[in-house]
UniProtKB/Swiss-Prot annotation:
This protein's encoding gene: Act87E
Residues making up the propeptide: 1-2
GO cellular component: actin cytoskeleton; cytoplasm; NuA4 histone acetyltransferase complex
Methionine sulfoxide: modified positions: M45, M48
Example GO molecular function: ATP binding
Reactions accelerated catalytically: ATP + H2O = ADP + phosphate + H(+)
Matches recorded under InterPro entries: Actin, Actin/actin-like_CS, Actin_CS, ATPase_NBD
Record-given protein name: Actin-87E
Note in the entry: In Drosophila there are 6 closely related actin genes.
UniProt source species: Drosophila melanogaster (Fruit fly)
EC number: 3.6.4.-
Residue list for modification Tele-methylhistidine: H74
Superkingdom per UniProt: Eukaryota
Length: 376
């Protein structure tokens, strides 16, 4: 970017984490939990500067005395007041910028309701007075980040997973599939199976501990049955984890039983297909001529695709479903946790993109509906 141009802000609002930074950077400056916390108790000490709400890391660190809420559920914003708090926190506390001076690129879940995009647009222009904004689909940005224009993206975050086939830069909406199974469900499942082991995790604060156990110790088995047998026969797969109070817990087959539910949702009592079948079904909804290109470009993105072993297992499962002659390639870049944000950073700094922004002037003339004409 040249210096006389002002850098655009890129904000990827995930159900679990908000990623924010400046277009042209190679990684987000700020990554914090999409959480708003409110005190459960009455403040008694005067002059402590107690607030009526806390956002992000501060809410996380004071979680013992707060009730934590996530304003984004299953990838879709459900609580606009809290969402506004998160955006305010993003601009003023994390990035320390004045939003009225920068174009803002926001991301949205595939198949986001139309009213939601309008509301996002309205808040950006009316509450934050942004000079320009744009809303991009998360999975499309992940594909940009991998340097492709054609492929199928499996984007699995904290609140929702999607398979989005994209051909020459266009998402194919009729073939997008959504799976309400993602990181948060896996955390809840891990809480459940650890409870069966005799460890009790119940509160919203303890759930965050379990999330940490999941991120540090879980992995995907290449062959689940065989791994279960190994775990039963020896202690080679056991790992220990120290809780904040110093208590040490041991976790064995839970390490791979938890993420196995991505491939077998029946573990969670869900009747849906696993992520491998969902990818396959999504490809099968596309035109027969482009399937070959999709099989050869299966791109993983989002935090829930970070488990060790997930790409190999995916390769194995898709190979079993697809025609035998077809070449299957799984792309799982190491930075895939942030690939939506990175794609946004790339897009917002392209010279060809500059005419795509919705300007404040266009918004004032046409109203929130402008977002459907300019962002597709």
């Amino acid at each position: 970017m040249c210096d006389d141009e002002v850098a655009a802000l890129v904000v990827d609002n995930g159900s679990g984490m908000c990623k924010a930074g400046f277009a042209g950077d190679d990684a987000p400056r700020a990554v914090f939990p999409s959480i708003v916390g409110r005190p459960r108790h009455q403040g008694v000490m005067v002059g402590m500067g107690q607030k009526d709400s806390y956002v992000g890391d501060e809410a996380q660190s004071k979680r013992g005395i707060l009730t934590l809420k996530y304003p984004i559920e299953h990838g879709i914003i459900t609580n606009w007041d809290d969402m506004e708090k998160i955006w305010h926190h993003t601009f003023y506390n994390e990035l320390r910028v004045a939003p009225e001076e920068h174009p803002v690129l926001l991301t949205e879940a595939p198949l986001n309701p139309k009213a939601n995009r309008e509301k996002m647009t309205q808040i950006m222009f009316e509450t934050f007075n942004a000079p320009a904004m744009y809303v991009a689909i998360q999975a499309v940005l992940s594909l940009y980040a991998s340097g492709r224009t054609t492929g199928i993206v499996l984007d699995s975050g904290d609140g929702v997973s999607h398979t989005v086939p994209i051909y020459e830069g266009y998402a194919l909406p009729h073939a997008i599939l959504r799976l309400d199974l993602a990181g948060r469900d896996l955390t809840d499942y891990l809480m459940k199976i650890l409870t069966e082991r005799g460890y009790s995790f119940t509160t919203t604060a303890e759930r965050e501990i379990v999330r940490d156990i999941k991120e540090k110790l879980c992995y995907v088995a290449l062959d689940f049955e065989q791994e279960m047998a190994t775990a039963a026969a020896s202690t080679s797969l056991e790992k220990s984890y120290e809780l904040p109070d110093g208590q040490v817990i041991t976790i064995g087959n839970e390490r791979f039983r938890c993420p196995e539910s991505l491939f077998q949702p029946s573990f969670l009592g869900m009747e849906s297909c696993g992520i491998h079948e969902t990818v396959y079904n999504s490809i099968m909804k596309c035109d027969v001529d482009i399937r070959k290109d999709l099989y050869a470009n299966i791109v993983m993105s989002g935090g829930t695709t970070m488990y060790p072993g997930i790409a190999d297992r995916m390769q194995k499962e898709i190979t079993a479903l697809a025609p035998s002659t077809i070449k299957i390639k799984i792309i799982a870049p190491p930075e895939r946790k942030y690939s939506v944000w990175i794609g946004g950073s790339i897009l917002a700094s392209l010279s060809t993109f500059q005419q795509m922004w919705i300007s404040k002037q266009e918004y004032d003339e046409s109203g929130p509906g402008i977002v459907h004409r300019k962002c597709f």
